[in-house]
């Protein structure tokens, strides 16, 4: 299965095309736009990923947008909550068409990136981040293609 992983609408937009565990393409938007920490995807980046990997079978986005909007609502960030431009399904339609988008937890995205690029068959993983959807710190146990969350610290608590 060919998977296109996307991080956008935050800082450091990036994509990775993976097939059966092999990275076919990976790139950051700032390399294409020249804008440091660019949050927007651009057409050339996506075109390169499709040129190297073809059309993906699945598109995976790095966070769950409705949980993030709920956190923004609770934090009083009403402009962000009401904006549809920062919804991945709206933002990505020009890039991935009607492809179904699977949303995974922000901290699980970090955990997977660390685990799948490590040489270990099983691992404990600690993710400490300013904030994901609600989580600020998580501890995972991973083996094979399984991830089990063992601990979670939630917003507004953070290290």
Language model regions located:
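Short acidic/glycine-rich loops and adjacent helix/strand connectors
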Residues: 1-159
């Amino acid at each position: 299965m060919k998977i296109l992983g996307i991080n956008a609408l935050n800082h450091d937009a990036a994509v990775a095309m993976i097939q059966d565990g092999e990275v076919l393409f990976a790139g950051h938007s700032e390399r294409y736009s020249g804008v440091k920490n660019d949050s927007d995807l651009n057409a050339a980046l996506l075109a390169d990923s499709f040129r190297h990997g073809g059309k993906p079978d699945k598109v995976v986005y790095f966070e769950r947008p409705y949980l993030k909007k709920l956190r923004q609502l609770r934090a009083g960030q009403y402009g962000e909550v009401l904006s549809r431009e920062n919804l991945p399904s709206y933002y990505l339609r020009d890039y991935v068409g009607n492809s179904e988008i699977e949303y995974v937890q922000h901290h699980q995205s970090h955990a997977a990136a660390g685990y799948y690029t490590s040489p270990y068959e099983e691992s404990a993983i600690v993710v400490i981040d300013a904030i994901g959807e609600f989580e600020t710190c998580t501890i995972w146990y991973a083996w094979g293609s399984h991830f089990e969350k063992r601990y979670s610290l939630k917003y507004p608590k953070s290290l």
